């Protein structure tokens, strides 16, 4: 039965692919740029390359997507600006926090401890988040969402400090990105939050400017933070996601057939990040241990008990109704 099912699935995919290929002559020659800030070894770059390959394959090579990883074309605010204004970036991968500067209600997604598992997060993204944000992203950002990439659950790393409960972070100088939710989270814990550009984070850790940072394990490993941090606390305080976005004018200029190609490639790229980020998390933690990091489980309830002020701040930014509706959708 399993072999029959797999064979049928393969046949359906092949038929769909042939359908695209058969119409390859209908696609115009076109070059698109896709830029992001993740390391070349990161799952997001693998997904970006899959997107480029599928677009090329499904258009018979007529449409080529050039991928620019690791901030080659600028940091995320710069990439968003270029894409928003129809500059050199046609497609980009953007964080929720950077998108929230255009669409304030997206701040709701920055609330701490919203999700307990990858499965819960994925179901909420598919059934609520995508339709919830699509219209506003198109109207206020002038971009079309093509998918939501997993970035992973964020955890805390430290140098010379063991974190097992919330109070262990009190007074600790920690780098936090400019996300309203993450800043509110660590402020509520009594940490000494510092907003440092990601491009400067490694050197800041190495030089002791900050003693701690927080990121998904895939990022911690890909960017070699284990070289200047010796402890990993599995706080899982925030499920991070980033959107694959395309300039709306560019998308609208395409034929319906090419739009279908772009959207299919976007969802396939999204699903690859889900497979890689969640599927490799345990393996990456073992790799971090092998690099010398000590890994600790934490008392998550001690963290959750302190999140009241963080939720109040976030509700003011996104609107209490938006935050309440998101929480209801998750439950």
Roles of regions detected by a PLM:
Residues 10, 25-123, 129, 135-331:
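N-terminal secretory/targeting leader peptides
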């Amino acid at each position: 039965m399993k072999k029959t099912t797999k064979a049928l699935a393969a046949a359906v995919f092949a038929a769909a692919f042939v359908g695209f290929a058969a119409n390859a002559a209908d696609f115009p020659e076109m070059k698109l740029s896709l830029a992001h800030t993740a390391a070349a070894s990161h799952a997001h770059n693998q997904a970006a390359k899959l997107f480029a390959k599928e677009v090329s394959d499904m258009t018979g090579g007529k449409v080529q997507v050039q991928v620019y990883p690791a901030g080659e074309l600028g940091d995320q605010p710069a990439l968003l600006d270029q894409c928003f204004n129809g500059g050199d970036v046609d497609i980009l991968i953007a964080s929720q926090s950077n998108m929230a500067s255009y669409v304030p209600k997206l701040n709701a997604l920055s609330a701490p401890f919203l999700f307990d598992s990858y499965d819960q997060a994925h179901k909420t993204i598919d059934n609520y988040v995508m339709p919830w944000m699509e219209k506003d992203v198109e109207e206020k950002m002038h971009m079309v969402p093509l998918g939501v990439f997993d970035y992973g659950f964020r955890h805390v790393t430290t140098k010379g400090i063991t974190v097992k409960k919330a109070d262990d972070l009190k007074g600790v100088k920690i780098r936090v990105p400019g996300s309203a939710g993450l800043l509110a989270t660590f402020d509520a814990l009594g940490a000494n939050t510092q907003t440092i550009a990601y491009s400067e984070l490694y050197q800041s850790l190495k030089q002791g400017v900050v003693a701690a940072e927080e990121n998904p394990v895939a990022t911690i490993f890909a960017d070699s933070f284990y070289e200047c941090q010796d402890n990993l606390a599995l706080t899982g305080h925030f499920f991070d996601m980033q959107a694959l976005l395309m300039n709306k004018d560019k998308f609208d200029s395409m034929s319906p057939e090419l739009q279908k190609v772009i959207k299919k490639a976007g969802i396939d790229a999204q699903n690859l990040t889900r497979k890689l980020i969640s599927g490799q998390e345990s393996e990456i933690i073992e790799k971090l241990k092998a690099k010398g990091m000590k890994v600790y489980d934490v008392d998550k309830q001690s963290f959750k008990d302190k999140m009241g002020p963080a939720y109040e701040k976030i509700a003011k930014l996104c609107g209490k109704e938006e935050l309440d509706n998101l929480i209801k959708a998750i439950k």
